[in-house]
A protein has these predicted regions:
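Charged, structured surface patches that assemble and position nucleic-acid processing machinery
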Residues: 27-34, 52, 117-136
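Generic marker of "main functional regions" within proteins
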Residues: 36-41, 45, 49-50, 76, ...
Length: 136
């Protein structure tokens, strides 16, 4: 895996998702969330580092936490995804939100089938998604 850090990709995601229509497309269109329309009236998007990996974080209303990460930066998927899912669950609980979705971006579509059991074992409101891309 390429572990070189490239903040440009995360910056692009953050900029794109700051547009409401892009956030709606990601959450509803790509992730399949049936969230009510009002959560899109108040959402935050920011970039930060978790366990030395850059992520883009979306907090949608008072309901949904989404972390987006570049799969190319994940050296050990089983271990890393497990850590991120657990940390996301803890953050969701700390903030009093309803759901957490970890989104891995890149050509790793087999990871969703291979590692989704990690999310299932934690909580039915924790989800793992693997997408080839999140913005056009």
């Amino acid at each position: 895996m390429d572990t070189e850090k490239n903040p440009t990709k995360e910056s692009d995601w953050q900029r794109e998702l700051a547009e409401r229509s892009r956030a709606v497309f990601l959450v509803r269109g790509l992730l399949g969330c049936a969230c009510p329309e009002e959560i899109f009236d108040h959402y935050q998007v920011r970039q930060h580092v978790i366990a030395s990996l850059p992520v883009v974080e979306l907090i949608m209303g008072d309901r949904l936490l989404v972390w987006i990460m570049d799969g190319n930066k994940v050296a050990e998927p089983g271990q890393t995804l497990g850590q991120f899912l657990k940390a996301g669950l803890e953050e969701r609980e700390r903030r009093g939100l309803n759901r957490f979705r970890l989104v891995v971006v890149g050509d790793f579509l087999s990871w969703e089938q291979q590692w989704t059991h990690l999310a299932d074992a934690l909580d039915p409101r924790v989800h793992l998604h693997v997408l080839p891309k999140i913005v056009a």
